């Protein structure tokens, strides 16, 4: 009994203790909740003077660093899928400019209001590593089927999304983003922004103090959220409380947010405006890097070289005096504390030494006494444009004078770098300049702003010609007439804008190597050259993690082509298509020496016969014969291309009538060349293209017999079947012969490559069998295709020679002019085993060719119809 009483008392005691514990817990919880609320309210009501370096003042609890799921880069190709509003929308163009400047691959499509999105996978691999929406509303308003399809792809292939929201006059003051725990407040005027230093996406961007001042425009969107997946990247304030009554002007708001993927497994970065604000560009580049798993990323290393052209050149009052030279030296030392190995690179024209005022001549002397402090490179002696010199010897004389001046004054002559006045002769290439440079100076490197064109600057590239490395050169807004700060074109604010996040800043941001062109006059008077680069370097170091350094020109060139080896080969263009190019191209040259059409092959299909038939027309003129390749120039497909367009155009006569005369060339190797279509489209983009197709099996056999007749060792050692059926173990000469027999017969593959660069209306496909049996009809079709006049009557001009077995030109007196003895040879018929092998080998290629011809609206040749019947 006592035991039961004791148990009851213990139970009551336990109940009392539990109740007491619960009450204490409630009190403690209430205290901390109230304290947390007060702390949060304190964090939200932040003053405008807050600095981002003090993390305690940041207004979002989500600014605490969270673990982000790593991006799996193995499942996708490194390509961006870009949805734009239209082909010409400004934001879309700005996005493309950054992608192209960064050399990131992208595929642009118009964002569908309704309908399907493009295919996202290919053979089980994702085609895109990142999706960008110019208008994020197009993404959130997609129909459920396509949105689910896209988001499933993003989750499965570890793909992220970047989106922009640009408010307009129709935007509601506030709204919730459909499908997201995210509120948008639109059309706001903002000021004083800073970068969240704890944002995980920061790579290039540094988070310094607040960027004071109003943000451009009054159409900003800010984001508010109540989910741990969101983290602010860029924060700012309202300019005034009147912007929106429900928001406090003392609160910090996010204009760029990062979605860590905790909500639905997809990481995103959203921008509350376009890319007009320079910080948005910087963060956009970092967002691409982070969300692509660093596959689409820019290195932090930046090489800059500042050239000062026209040393000793310039009229009185625009040159450097002693104080200017001392300032140049002092600034160089200052910049060396921020840019490793920084050295100004001085380009001189010795003829103009001591042609200024007395003070300016003293400046010349101080420059020469300080010669070892700088790097030096030769301009032309008299600052003449090299393309005006029509022979190499005259250029050599000018260069020798400048070299003698350099030797007399102790200027180093072994830097291996030169710049031509106005970049004349560098591109378009003036071969005499390259030859003279090598002969007198041993030049290894030059630079130009003209390749392939001056604008847009992001397309500038390098190339190598005649063993001289040509680097892209950048402008910086300083020209010979840019002398005074207050008189800067558009006002001094334009120069400052370029430095502080504008064009000049972006040049360094987006180019791993930048050679800047400045002039002597930029370092006198207001010394805008010094002002520009001191402020530019300070700004870059304040806002980025970029590592700035300088290399001598030759080392810089080697570094450039290590980064961009694909640029070594030039891509020649028609100088007459760019006014700037034509202005710095010799007047002795003419673009009339370029062909209007090309006969591209393939070999052993009847191209020589077509060539001779074309020459019968009074208005059609071919190239002059080559001593090595006879009637074929073979320019676009091989090493001849590196000899330049002057070499190529020398093969063509001057037409008597540039309108009615048609220059052409026939090179049968062009057809299957990987380089020829792109090169031809660059130099002669309006040219028409003619190709001839016969049964690829017959073509392969004919090539084999052709090689036997030319005593090719492999063709003599192996029979035809052994050649076409050999495996990977075969000796190199046999594999080479096999490729030359088989690969040109991949007709659809090669034609598609040409159609990548030329319109279908520029391509004529001739049935080789019809050309052999009925050439007059084919030539009528060719004339119509070319638009050549007058129409030539081939029916009366051609006659069949039964002895030769093909058609010949009928001359006066009944004589004929036929193909040479090497053409139309009689070979033993192909063995059945080889015929069967080739029929199987080309089956898929022939099917693809039939599809291509159907798409082009062209009839199928008889041989192709016969081969397709075998497929069934």
From Swiss-Prot:
Region span, Heparan sulfate N-deacetylase 4: 36-588
Active site: 604
Subcellular location: Golgi apparatus membrane
GO molecular function, one term: N-acetylglucosamine deacetylase activity
S-S bonds: 808-818
Reaction(s) the record says it catalyses: alpha-D-glucosaminyl-[heparan sulfate](n) + 3'-phosphoadenylyl sulfate = N-sulfo-alpha-D-glucosaminyl-[heparan sulfate](n) + adenosine 3',5'-bisphosphate + 2 H(+)
Record EC number: 2.8.2.8, 3.-.-.-, 2.8.2.-
A cellular-component GO term for this protein: Golgi membrane
Pathway: Glycan metabolism; heparan sulfate biosynthesis; Glycan metabolism; heparin biosynthesis
A Pfam family assignment: Sulfotransfer_1
Transmembrane domains' residue ranges: 14-34
Stretch list, region Heparan sulfate N-sulfotransferase 4: 589-872
Segments in the Lumenal topological domain: 35-872
InterPro entries, alphabetized: Heparan_SO4_deacetylase_dom (IPR021930), HSNSD_N (IPR056793), NST/OST (IPR037359), P-loop_NTPase (IPR027417), Sulfotransferase_dom (IPR000863)
Bilayer topology annotation: Single-pass type II membrane protein
Keyword Disulfide bond: yes
Coiled-coil segments: none
Binding site for 3'-phosphoadenylyl sulfate: 604-608, 702, 823-827
Cytoplasmic side stretches: 1-13
Glycosylation sites: 226, 341, 391, 657, 793
Gene3D superfamilies per the UniProt record, alphabetical: P-loop containing nucleotide triphosphate hydrolases
Description of how the protein assembles with itself and partners: Monomer.
Misc. remarks from the entry: The presence of 4 different heparan sulfate N-deacetylase/N-sulfotransferase enzymes in mammals, as well as differences in their enzyme activity suggest that some initiate heparan sulfate modification/sulfation reactions, whereas other later on fill in or extend already modified heparan sulfate sequences.
Similarity remark: Belongs to the sulfotransferase 1 family. NDST subfamily.
Protein name per Swiss-Prot or TrEMBL: Bifunctional heparan sulfate N-deacetylase/N-sulfotransferase 4
Taxonomic lineage of the native organism: Eukaryota, Metazoa, Chordata, Craniata, Vertebrata
